[in-house]
Amino acid sequence: YGVKRETQIVYPKDAAMIGFKLNIRCGSRVIEVGAGSGALTLLFSRLAGPEGQVVSFEKEERHFRNAQKNLDRLGSLKNVSLHQDDVTGYEDEEFDAAFIDVREPWLHMEKVRSLLKAGGLLGTIVPTANQVSDCLRGLQAGFGDIEVMEIMLRYYKINAERLRPQDRMVAHTGYLAFARKIEEIVPPQA
């Protein structure tokens, strides 16, 4: 996208999986916690299309300004609302999907869960296994279908007589966790 970045990047291999696993498509309503430089915001916007909505929050002023510049520079995104704040507002609305890309995503899971519709999808990305463990603890209440993955992508040298992997690859770029909001089943009163 040509995004000027000041934050850790989400690699295309991870971004593609995030869009796929969150099932973001035309008309989707998406919450993003941690806009960073706005690259994923752009992806979510394009996947959701003109009928969709992306509501993005970035608490850090410097990152917010950079994301805003990137979004402005790369065209009119009428389906994006960028807020310099923690996740606030929108309590009376429901979203199809949410993505959290901050240092401690588990601290936002309860709030984000309250904004997801029943069956809504949540994703996170973190760089360390310890953070994955904390995310899993945060997902224990109110989420199911939990998955954790790491995407490895290896390119090959293009030579029909000696097809083999390239000598270098970007291996670990982050751990992705995905889950689905589940509703509590309240037994009927006798």
What is each stretch, according to the model?
Residues 11, 36-37:
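Conserved SAM/SAH-binding loop
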Residues 20-25, 47, 91-92, 114:
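Glycine-rich helix-loop-beta junction characteristic of Rossmann-like nucleotide cofactor-binding loops
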Residues 37-50:
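Conserved SAM-binding loop of SAM-dependent methyltransferases across substrates and taxa
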Residues 48-49, 76, 116-120:
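Helix-to-beta-strand junctions that scaffold the AdoMet/dcAdoMet cofactor pocket
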Residues 51-55:
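Short beta-strand element of Class I
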Residues 106-175:
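C-terminal substrate-binding/active-site "lid" region of AdoMet-derived donor-dependent transferases
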